[in-house]
Amino acid sequence: MSKCSRCLLDETVPELKINDKGWCQYCEIYDRLCINYPIGEKGQEKWNQILAAIKASKSKYNCIVGISGGVDSTYTLLQAKKMGLNPLAVHCDTGWNTKIAVTNIKKACSILKVELVTLVIDWEEFRDLQRSFLRSSTPDADIPADIAILATLFRVASKYKIKYILNGHSFRTEFMNPIGWTYYDGTYIKNIQKQFGEKKLKKFPNFTISEYVKHVIIKRTKIIQFLNYVDYSKEQAKEILVTELDWKDPGGHHHENSFTHFFQSYYLPTKFGIDKRKVKLSADVLSGRISRHQGIDELKITYPIDMQVVDYAIKKLQLSQDEFNSIMNEKPKSFLDYQTNANFISRVWWAIDFLYKIGIVQDLVYHKYKILTKIMKKKK
């Protein structure tokens, strides 16, 4: 059984590799990210340089902040305003927002006097796409939302001629989803829908390689993870948001979205034995907020399941109970069983490596694709 002796990742991560120290490759990536994104004085110096570049922008808005109503994105928006930035808040509505999340978004933008752009995804197409991914029997049923959000942020940035997108991800609190648990690309989206869907995707904002080249390489639009440069505490952030923005906690990790709540608490653990708390708790272990033993004890507690959320998801997706049961009983598969861009990415790894070295490709993208390239070479 493969199990990392440092974090909490184990044999449920198909690509897990253990080095001579007993650590996995994701721990090694964490260490590299700590070097690239220091906190304290060095982190502040790096952030000040980025902040100056953002403020030098001549656009009406000097940055975009993607907002979901959760703690990380709302805190990022608050800090952007406090640092003197003029952000445009962007929300991608996939039809699964909780009332608490919607209220949090509206209150934050109102109190901070930030303009909000909300793009509503075509529900009929999106529902059909989500059903397609459930029918594909892969653990990637939540990636249509990730793709839609990413595409939306870049397209809004292009429309308003904005070069910087701030997001609320921090590797110290969120770590990094293993590829075997979460893989996405535009070709994957197209082919899963073609194989399992009932509708053509005419309005869905897919994010293809050509879109990546257009926005990231040609237009040089950058995604900035502000929280990587600061000593970020979710609990302290929540207290600040409650006090300053009358923010309400949606509940669990990413439970501001009802589908993600269903997906992480029921679908993944029940069908695949995947517990995404391992990622979050691994971040807590590696950053020293808890001990590894505390993390292990936390995982012994069964992921709380709200059957009302499960029933709501099945009903909203318009799945019969028989079809849902069939989906849950189908043999698990992965992105490797379907047509994706993975082979292409592994073939052009030299280009990705070059673009990373000159500061165009993001750290997390680079490291994830490096692991992917090794997976694809091994597959051959």
Predicted regions and their residues:
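Hydrophobic positions on the alpha1 helix immediately C-terminal to the Walker A/P-loop
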Residues: 75-76
